[in-house]
Each structure stands twice: as structure tokens, then as C-alpha cells.
Amino acid sequence: MKKPFNVLAIIGKPRDQQAIQTHKEIYHWLRSLGYTVFIDDRLREILTDLPTEHFASLIELGKKADLAIVVGGDGNMLGAARVLSRFDISVIGVNRGNLGFLTDLNPEDFQQRLQEVLDGHYLQETRFLLEAEIHRHGQVKSHNAALNEAVLHPGKIAHMIEFEVYIDDNFAFSQRSDGLIVSTPTGSTAYSLSGGGPILSPSLNAITLVPMFPHTLSCRPLVVGGNQRIKLVVSPENRGTQEVSCDGQVSLPVSPGDEIHIYQSPNVLKLIHPQDYSYYHVLRTKLGWSSKLF
């Protein structure tokens, strides 16, 4: 029987000794099974006892590997996703973070669950990303991708900003607020949820717009189609420099008068889960929802 995965990559920037140990355990276990294994280049100075030729950059890992094993929390997964979504590679997570909505495997007993995946017993789903572009005087000045959300916000100093929102070039509304969260279904359990946004099933082709502290009592989150293009026109009267934050990890500077174009990326993240994975079980356990009554 042909293996579904032959070349594996271990990704993640560990924050503590336990996470470092998890990286080592996964590496040696996979090598004992006969797999070709590459490791995130950021670990080169930490895992000094491993062969240097087995380290590679994220882009190289995306080109070489069939399956990426991301060790850490959702932050590590988000950082990897923005790069790996450009390549034909599947991704699974081992949770060494906090909530871990995107990282299914427990580091204490990863071997059995990961073995099932390597044997071909798994679920795969695709998660779409957003592209965020900053347009100035008709030119794209900067851009990046986001798996969770792209957020327009005031930058380092909190203050109200003014902007207009267009959906497919149709004017939707203007707003004075602390900013706007534009979220994917994947991101609907992240920053968007904290801002009062709805939880969306990951299979939905939809985007949410969640205002941040709007200066009005009538403003509510808005859900639009996933294929619609969102344009935010920043008022030239705003003071200072604003920012668009992608997944809370990459910041794009925004000047008064700029346009922010946000749309669904052509790239998707191929996310692998154990065969018994249930999104609603994840919601119950991570968000502390009540169990069944009968």
C-alpha cells in the first residue's frame, strides 16, 4: 500500500524546554519509521545535535515535504500557514500552546494519532486565507496574507479613525471606530470572537466584518460572501499612520487616504485532522460550553 506521505517537515519555534523536547521526540520517532524528515531552519541553533543538512527554510519545506507537523500553538500554525498555503503540502498541528483551535494532537500521546494519519486514516479540509493589499495613489504599496483575520487599527496609540467600507465596489457604510476586523471562518474563534463577532463553521465560504468600538449604537457585525471583495477607504482627515495587521503577526502601514483591498486568496491551507475530529467538540472543550444533558 502506497504511503500518503513520504517526506515530512517539523515546524515551529519553541518557547520552552518542553516544546524543544517534543520536536526532538517527533524527529527521532519519524526517522525510526524510515521517513525522510526536514526541520524548520529556525531550530538550527536550538537542536544542535541534529544533522545540519536536515534543516531548511519554510519555503524549502513547502517545496520538499508532503506533510508539515507544526509544533506549538495557533500562532505557530498561523505563521506557517501563510507560507505553506502557497505549496502542495498538508499540515497537522501538535499543541504546545494555549487554546489550540488549529493544533489537534496532544504532545503526550502524539505517536498513536500521528501513526494513524501516516497510515492514511485522517480527515482533510481546506481553509481559505485572505489577501490584504494597501493601495496608495493607484499602486499596491504592500500586501500579505492572513489565515485568521486582517485588522485595520490605529497603530501604537489608540484613537478613533474614520473610513468607508465598500463591498464589490458598492458603498456599504462609513464608520468612526477603533478599527475593523475582517475575518475568515477560521478566524471567527479568534480576535473576531473577542470583538463580538459570530462563530462561523469552517466550511462556510463567508467573511465577517466586525467593528471595533464603533462610535454608534446601531453598528453590528456583518457577514458577506467569501468571494466578495472588500475595500476600506481611509479618510484623508485621519491623523498619523494606521496599520493593517495580518493574524497579529505582520503589520502593513496605512496612511490617510489609502485604500485597503481585502479578498479571498487563491491559496488554501490543507489542514489534516485525526479521523475522529469534530469541530463542535473542539468548540465545546476550548470555549467551555456545557456537555450534553441527556
Curated annotation (Swiss-Prot):
Task: Give the originating organism.
Answer: Vibrio cholerae serotype O1 (strain ATCC 39315 / El Tor Inaba N16961)
Question: In which family does this protein belong, per the annotation?
Answer: Belongs to the NAD kinase family.
| Name of the protein this chain belongs to | NAD kinase
Question: What Gene3D superfamilies does this protein map onto?
Answer: Probable inorganic polyphosphate/atp-NAD kinase, domain 1 (3.40.50.10330), Probable inorganic polyphosphate/atp-NAD kinase, domain 2 (2.60.200.30)
Q: What does this protein do?
A: Involved in the regulation of the intracellular balance of NAD and NADP, and is a key enzyme in the biosynthesis of NADP. Catalyzes specifically the phosphorylation on 2'-hydroxyl of the adenosine moiety of NAD to yield NADP.
Example GO CC term: the record gives: cytoplasm
Gene Ontology biological process terms in this record:
NAD metabolic process; NADP biosynthetic process
The record's section on InterPro entries has: ATP-NAD_kinase_N, ATP-NAD_kinase_PpnK-typ_C, NAD/diacylglycerol_kinase_sf, NADK
Where in the cell is the protein located? Answer: Cytoplasm
